């Protein structure tokens, strides 16, 4: 394939691919932001209400843990179909980029919660005990000890979540969710266009690599251990 042929192909398909890329970024950004806003506090609650936790409350911990486990165990495609009524209630439709954000967000929340819970478990108990001995309240310990000490792992969890959301957004495209996954299915698979299928796969890989590289750089910057 000559350079002119490649240039012509990209000229013909650039608008389609750029639009799909922005749709993917839009889905991942909104779902990630809401997922973190709800998942991080949920993870903190799971950690602090466990046995011998700062706010020990085993019934609450078990109830929330069960809900989180159920949320994590449902495959994303099944989740998308199962919550169609909820998606229609919130967005007004279950097809399209904005509609895909609803299941993406619901899928992200329990995922983030468990990652945050695991990140907080890495904080040495000695630091928490030292803060308690100085009279710090549970909220002060969470804000000034647990979260700052776990920040590198939390940032790594954010990176993992965003990468996962990219793959989920591609799956959303198989049922009309828009984005690069939608282009790969509609134009690559249904029209038997191997070139556009390959290009969308490469673009997804590049997007994941960019997210991972930025995440790794941020972790290195804040990790002073």
UniProtKB/Swiss-Prot annotation:
What is the protein's membrane topology class? Multi-pass membrane protein
Keyword list, A-Z: Amino-acid transport, Cell inner membrane, Cell membrane, Membrane, Transmembrane, Transmembrane helix, Transport
Q: Provide the GO biological process annotations.
A: D-methionine transmembrane transport
User: What InterPro entries has UniProt attached to this entry?
Assistant: AA_ABC_Transporter_Permease, MetI-like, MetI-like_sf
Q: Which Gene3D superfamilies match?
A: MetI-like
Has keyword Cytoplasm? Answer: no
Instruction: Name the protein family.
Output: Belongs to the binding-protein-dependent transport system permease family. CysTW subfamily.
What function does this protein fulfil? Answer: Part of the binding-protein-dependent transport system for D-methionine. Probably responsible for the translocation of the substrate across the membrane.
Name of the protein described by the UniProt record = Probable D-methionine transport system permease protein MetI
């Amino acid at each position: 394939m000559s350079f002119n042929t490649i240039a012509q192909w990209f000229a013909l398909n650039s608008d389609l691919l750029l639009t799909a890329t922005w749709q993917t970024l839009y889905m991942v950004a909104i779902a990630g932001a809401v997922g973190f806003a709800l998942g991080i506090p949920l993870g903190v609650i799971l950690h602090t209400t466990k046995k011998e936790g700062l706010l020990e409350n085993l019934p609450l911990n078990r109830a929330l843990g069960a809900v989180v486990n159920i949320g994590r165990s449902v495959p994303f495609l099944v989740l998308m179909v199962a919550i169609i009524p909820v998606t229609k209630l919130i967005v007004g439709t279950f097809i399209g980029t904005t509609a895909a954000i609803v299941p993406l967000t619901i899928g992200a929340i329990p995922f983030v919660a468990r990652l945050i819970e695991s990140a907080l478990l890495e904080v040495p108990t000695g630091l928490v005990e030292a803060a308690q001995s100085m009279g710090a309240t549970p909220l002060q310990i969470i804000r000034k000890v647990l979260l700052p000490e776990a920040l590198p792992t939390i940032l790594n969890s954010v990176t993992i979540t965003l990468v996962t959301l990219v793959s989920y957004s591609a799956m959303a495209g198989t049922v009309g969710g828009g984005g690069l996954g939608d282009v790969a299915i509609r134009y690559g698979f249904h029209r038997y266009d191997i070139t556009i299928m390959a290009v969308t796969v490469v673009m997804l890989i590049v997007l994941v690599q960019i997210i991972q590289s930025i995440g790794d750089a941020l972790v290195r910057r804040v990790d002073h251990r």
